[in-house]
């Protein structure tokens, strides 16, 4: 069941001389309840602009928006009253890269601030705020000030505050971008736990594919305001169609670094380099040994890695295949039958044109 439906959403920003910049261009997404939906792309791709249309912090120029069964926008026009919109926004929590904490108040007071519209006694307010801090494993820091916390702890406070109204949706807008790897992992683990514990729908906006790989169930890739690819995380990771997606998912930076360090000579017509991406669970035997046995080509491994894709082990190999054109064709066909995704690379690790 979809909790968020975006259909043909545009966001136009007027410029001088009557020109328009199309920050979001005809985007359609269906996000189901309980998804961890990653939206990934480089800076300026339109990710943040798009997700801010969900709660109408950014008004769309065209399209339809429906959230949890309520129509917010129809044909680019707001159809929900401002009063009802204010109530509906309480069901959508948001966290940001910059934390947005009140520096002059304690951690407990920061969380309590999000409950100011509730008719709670002081004791009830404190109890509720402490419960939220306990949820993010930060109850012991209740009387600390933000300046006394690490970046990861500040983000935990922001998450506790975002959960104050028991939302069904949490939007994470580059929330881990300013954190070190350890704190990033802890925040991602927390988001995943909250997703499972409360069936919380999480929308993860990031330019870091690693964050999406670790916890997302579905992913959309954005470029120049458009969604160029979308699907389940496994589908997009194992079978990317667009070049940008291949760059995001392939561990290509490590592969490029490795190939550059090898200083390979220019490849002959009987030599090809391929990046192979596959599910370790589905490919039980050694791919290289099987290629040699079945096809008779010579295969050299140049790079190898195994990582977890939302708890599923995924292997990445970069191999040099030597053989005549017919043998190379047979090798490609054999690998594709094994559900291995192939991307041809040049000797420097770039995607082969």
Swiss-Prot record:
Belongs to the ABC transporter superfamily. Methionine importer (TC 3.A.1.24) family. It comes from the Bacteria. Keywords: Amino-acid transport, ATP-binding, Cell membrane, Membrane, Nucleotide-binding, Translocase, Transport. Its EC number is 7.4.2.11. The complex is composed of two ATP-binding proteins (MetN), two transmembrane proteins (MetI) and a solute-binding protein (MetQ). This is Methionine import ATP-binding protein MetN. The keyword Transport applies. It is a peripheral membrane protein. It is an enzyme of class 7 (translocase). GO terms for cellular component: plasma membrane. It is found in: Cell membrane. The gene is metN. One of its GO terms (molecular function) is ABC-type D-methionine transporter activity. Residues 6-249 form the ABC transporter domain. Gene3D superfamilies: 3.30.70.260, P-loop containing nucleotide triphosphate hydrolases. The keyword Phosphoprotein does not apply. ATP binds at residues 41-48.
């Amino acid at each position: 069941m979809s909790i968020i439906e975006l259909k043909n959403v545009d966001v136009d920003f007027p410029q001088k001389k009557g020109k328009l910049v199309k920050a979001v261009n005809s985007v359609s997404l269906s996000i189901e309840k309980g998804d961890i939906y990653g939206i990934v792309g480089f800076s300026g791709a339109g990710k943040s602009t798009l997700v801010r249309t969900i709660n109408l912090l950014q008004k769309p120029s065209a399209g339809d928006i429906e959230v949890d069964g309520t129509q917010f926008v129809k044909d680019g026009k707001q159809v929900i009253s401002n009063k009802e919109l204010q109530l509906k926004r309480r069901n959508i929590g948001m966290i940001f890269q910059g934390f947005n904490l009140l520096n002059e108040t304690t951690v407990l007071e920061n969380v309590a601030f999000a409950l100011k519209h509730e008719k709670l006694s002081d004791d009830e307010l404190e109890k509720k705020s402490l419960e939220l801090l306990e949820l993010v494993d930060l109850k012991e820091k209740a009387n600390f000030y933000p300046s006394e916390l690490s970046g990861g702890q500040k983000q935990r406070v922001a998450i506790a505050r975002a959960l104050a109204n028991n939302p069904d949706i949490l939007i994470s807008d580059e929330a881990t971008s300013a954190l070190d790897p350890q704190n990033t992992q802890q925040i991602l683990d927390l988001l995943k736990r909250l997703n499972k514990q409360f069936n919380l729908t999480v929308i993860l906006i990031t330019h870091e594919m690693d964050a999406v790989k670790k916890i997302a169930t579905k992913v959309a890739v954005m470029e120049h305001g458009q969604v160029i690819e979308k699907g389940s995380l496994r589908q997009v990771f194992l079978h990317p169609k667009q070049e940008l997606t291949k760059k995001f998912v392939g561990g290509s930076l490590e592969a490029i670094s490795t190939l550059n360090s090898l200083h390979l000579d220019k490849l002959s017509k009987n030599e090809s380099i391929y990046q192979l991406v596959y599910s370790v669970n589905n490919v039980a035997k050694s791919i290289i040994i099987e290629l040699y046995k079945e096809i008779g080509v010579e295969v050299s491994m140049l790079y190898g890695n195994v990582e977890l894709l939302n708890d599923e082990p995924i292997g990445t190999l970069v191999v040099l295949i030597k053989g005549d054109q017919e043998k190379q064709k047979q090798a490609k066909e054999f690998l594709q039958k094994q559900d291995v995704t192939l991307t041809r690379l040049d000797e420097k690790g770039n995607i082969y044109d």
